[in-house]
Amino acid sequence: MTIKPSDSVSWFQVLQRGQHYMKTWPADKRLAPVFPENRVTVVTRFGIRFMPPLAIFTLTWQIALGGQLGPAIATALFACGLPLQGLWWLGKRAITPLPPTLLQWFHEVRHKLSEAGQAVAPIEPIPTYQSLADLLKRAFKQLDKTFLDDL
């Protein structure tokens, strides 16, 4: 079992890291077969946008029609909790260390950036998925679109 470097992260920091990871991860279709981040990001953004209004609508509808308050509150809390689950998953994923296969791929992309004359930041002692997202975002901006084909 791998030891995560940030086990002492609070739940609020995990949600913040999830939001940052969601903004950082490049939304490229070629990454979708390998990484679930594209799907989780799309669903989480959808949930952030539409679940709070749905929760309010459900709550007011149940109250206006004389329904019971308990199930209405439970449904509203469930609807508001869905985007939080996505942010939680993304936050936990962001602080997870890269497995050995992705670590090799991380170093190859980093090497391609340095070969292209781009300054690269020093490597963390244990690279995480967040550092991979930062690197991929930068590679998509500064390298040609075929850099993934060579890897």
Curated annotation (Swiss-Prot):
Name its cellular compartments. Cell inner membrane
Which keywords belong to this entry? Answer: Cell inner membrane, Cell membrane, Membrane, Transmembrane, Transmembrane helix
Annotated Pfam families = DUF412
Recorded GO cellular component terms are: plasma membrane
Q: Could you tell me the membrane topology recorded for this protein?
A: Multi-pass membrane protein
User: Mind telling me which residue stretches traverse the membrane in this protein?
Assistant: 46-66, 69-89
> Does Chaperone count among this protein's keywords?
no
Principal subcellular localisation of the protein: membrane
Give the UniProt family note: Belongs to the UPF0208 family.
Can you say what this protein is called? UPF0208 membrane protein YpsIP31758_1444
